[in-house]
Amino acid sequence: MFQTVTAPTGVWRGRVTGDVTVFHGIQYARADRFAPPQRCEPQLQHLVEVPEPGPIAPQSPSRLEGVMGAPSSLKQSEACLTVTVTTPHLAQPGSLPVLVWLHGGAFLSGSGAWEQYGAEQLVRETGIVVVSVNYRLGVLGYLCAPGISSGNLGLLDQITALEWVRDNIEAFGGDNGRVTLDGQSAGAHSIVAMLGIDRARSLFSRAIIQSAPLGLGFHSVEQARRAAEIFEEELGSDPRRAVVTDILAAQARTAHRLAGRGAMNSAPPFLPVHGMAPLPFVGEWNGKVAANAARRKILIGNTRDEMAAFFGPHPVFSAMRRVPLAGPQLAGAIQRRVQKVVFDNPVQEFADRFASAGASVWRYGIGPLHPDNPFGACHCIDIPLLFGDGDTWRDAPMLRPLSPKEIGESGTRTRRYWGEFVHTGRISDPAWPMHRPKSRYAHLLTDETIGGSA
């Protein structure tokens, strides 16, 4: 069964499954290599039907496949600027709030079209419209090299996708005046960047910031150009004409060089760049973040053991843990310290900054889903609480030994909270108070107590 929607920029046919319709592969922009995205011209004379997920951005396998499991294999293409829209079947135009999802992946991997980000269960339980975004990654999205690319193309893609939502989502049942921008990891990092970008200011009124590695910051122009120089050395040819496989191989070698001895620096080699459009220099950006956060509704938090996803498989720390007695203690202490620097302390700082600027802020935490899993509450364990279903995630190492039924049930509370926030911009649970500056309280979404008192 199918449903056809006519929007200002096109006519699309989606597949109906029960009471939910999914529209795959809707193109929101076009872009030549290293060029800013250009909005697509309206194509109202042609019906577009994409029964399966469209192509994803060129990328190498995610470094977190050993935690999340491998995603379904999807075609890769530079023509990847598409969204997936999931909506209640036959929703009245403009009637429902919208959640726009920005995937993570260290700005190197990921896709809004991955099966793990399927939004059918979330839409069915909450009655919202979900838009999942593909954007350019790695060198093709964030290279900052004079004469080749100004950088921040992936960020521009995301903003252009939000503009597509503003102009078209009403036809799919969404209310463009009630848009919540939600992202995890690099996607959440992007949302924080957008809070300081004027062009993005009016495109969403609510934000959900999940496990943003805010301690990494963004690149300065100097840092970005140094990464570009290393990449160009590794590529050995003009990136404007190189084949994608060569670009990805040189990108991997660049990451290896920047990681240093023992691969101890795991920061992404390519990030949004302060001082290159549309992201202001850091001083101006800080001021804009404070101004743009005022009167917004923001949900922000992270997991208890973010770094376990990175330290668990890391060869240096695997060897350290094998040292009798002191080894596991030392590895654990280093992991906890890095967790505080990259995640815990910056999340606290930004929650305080947002609240001090006049935003309504709620802070959450996530503990382990099963006591016997060695990854604990690692980075990305929040995703199956929202997206996919038990069968989608059944092979994820971070969720063992949970059954598909237990995986599906583990996210019921989180999906209920997220649905309420997207609908109302608030959390009504009296046990979850609004964040006050300097409060250490984070409301736990799993069955364990962390954080301080409210």
Swiss-Prot record:
Induction section of the entry: Up-regulated by PQS.
EC number(s) stated in the UniProt entry for this protein: 3.5.1.-
Record field: catalytic activity: N-octanoylanthranilate + H2O = anthranilate + octanoate + H(+)
Intrachain S-S bonds: none
Source organism superkingdom: Bacteria
Example of a GO MF term: hydrolase activity
Family assignment from sequence similarity: Belongs to the type-B carboxylesterase/lipase family.
Function: Involved in the degradation of the Pseudomonas aeruginosa quorum sensing signal molecules HHQ (2-heptyl-4-quinolone) and PQS (2-heptyl-3-hydroxy-4-quinolone) to anthranilic acid. Probably catalyzes the hydrolysis of N-octanoylanthranilic acid to anthranilic acid.
Protein's UniProt name: Probable N-octanoylanthranilate hydrolase AqdA2
Species of origin: Rhodococcus erythropolis (Arthrobacter picolinophilus)
Gene: aqdA2
